[in-house]
């Protein structure tokens, strides 16, 4: 059995490993980023109350106003809550990317930086 993952490199340094199934939603996310009137947007991952542990909520948020640009619910093959917990940012608040806070860390993973490159791996 092979495992497919995508690696997103943000601003050329911060890397995120995401399951292939989750990557399939990035077409919509890229479009939301490019069509956003403000370049100051970030991605927020969370689980939704009342949905299964295998449902991931992916939102694009404008960082200045915290206005929701777009959101999608994704059914994953991997437990979304466990995936968020294992991939959440573990840094001092002062070192966290712009427009993130402790509430974001507790609820999911937020990124304010733009995706620099995307690579696909299968192993």
Curated annotation (Swiss-Prot):
It comes from the Eukaryota. GO terms for biological process: microtubule cytoskeleton organization. Disruption phenotype: Microtubules are shorter than normal. Required for normal microtubule organization. This is Aberrant microtubules protein 1. It comes from Saccharomyces cerevisiae (strain ATCC 204508 / S288c).
């Amino acid at each position: 059995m092979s495992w497919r993952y995508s690696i997103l490199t943000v601003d050329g340094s911060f890397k995120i490993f995401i399951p292939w199934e989750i990557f399939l939603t990035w077409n919509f996310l890229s479009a939301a980023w490019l069509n956003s009137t403000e370049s100051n947007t970030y991605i927020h991952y969370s689980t939704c109350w009342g949905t299964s542990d295998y449902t991931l909520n992916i939102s694009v948020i404008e960082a200045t106003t915290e206005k929701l640009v777009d959101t999608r619910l994704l059914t994953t093959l991997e437990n979304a809550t466990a995936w968020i917990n294992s991939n959440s940012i573990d840094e001092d608040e002062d070192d966290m990317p712009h427009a993130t806070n402790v509430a974001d860390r507790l609820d999911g993973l937020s990124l304010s930086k733009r995706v620099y490159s995307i690579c696909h791996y299968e192993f």
